[in-house]
UniProtKB/Swiss-Prot annotation:
Protein name: Der GTPase-activating protein YihI
Keyword GTP-binding among UniProt keywords: no
A GO MF label: GTPase activator activity
Keywords: GTPase activation, Ribosome biogenesis
Ranges of Basic residues composition bias in the record: 33-42
Bias type Basic and acidic residues, positions: 22-32, 55-67
Annotated HAMAP family: GAP_YihI (MF_01058)
Length: 181
């Protein structure tokens, strides 16, 4: 048999059938996985370095939080002073304002004004708070009723302040020590 040479002229043979494939996501993923399986290990050369995102992720895991702190550190340790009772204690004005704005006390006072009888515990609470308010107002000078009595308690001291030096000398000369025996 003699050999027949193939010719490349159009129309000689039937037209090649063009097959178009619709590639799905699954096909694309399977090809990528196959490519990764073939290429195990690291890429050759320094120019094929890891991506920056992966490097940052690895460095973040290894980073020690104690290293690189910008917070200033005191070289001399000062002993912390505990706050004293006076520093923790409220001033008279603050305590008075707090008692005057006490919601529970106001409700109980309204109940008393309406003629309702309170229990012994609540009545005791109201009495204590009102006594404390009165005491604080007296300390702050907001109550004028009690102050004149305290001043008049020692009238001889008030008179001595008004005397002159000559009067005091005369009183000293007339002083009798036998009165105190």
């Amino acid at each position: 048999m003699s050999r027949i040479k193939k010719a490349r002229k159009p129309g000689m043979s039937s037209q090649p059938v063009v097959v178009t494939r619709n590639r799905t996501d699954r096909d694309v993923e399977s090809r990528e996985l196959k490519r990764k399986r073939k290429r195990k290990g690291l890429k050759a050369g320094a120019r094929n370095a890891e991506s920056n995102a992966e490097q940052a992720r690895r460095n973040a895991q290894k980073k020690d939080p104690r290293i690189g702190s910008k917070k200033p550190i005191q070289l001399v340790v000062d002993a912390k002073q505990k706050t004293t009772k006076q520093e923790r204690r409220l001033t008279n004005e603050q305590e008075l304002a707090m008692l005057e704005n006490d919601a529970q006390l106001m409700v109980l006072l309204d109940r008393l004004d309406s003629g309702e009888n309170l229990g012994t515990g609540l009545q005791k609470y109201v009495d204590e708070k009102l006594a404390r308010i009165e005491h604080l107002m007296g300390r702050l000078g907001l109550l004028d009723d009690e102050e004149p009595e305290e001043i008049e308690e020692f009238p001889e001291f008030a008179e001595r302040k008004a005397k002159s030096d000559d009067d005091l000398l005369a009183e000293f000369d007339d002083f009798n020590m036998d009165d105190f025996k």
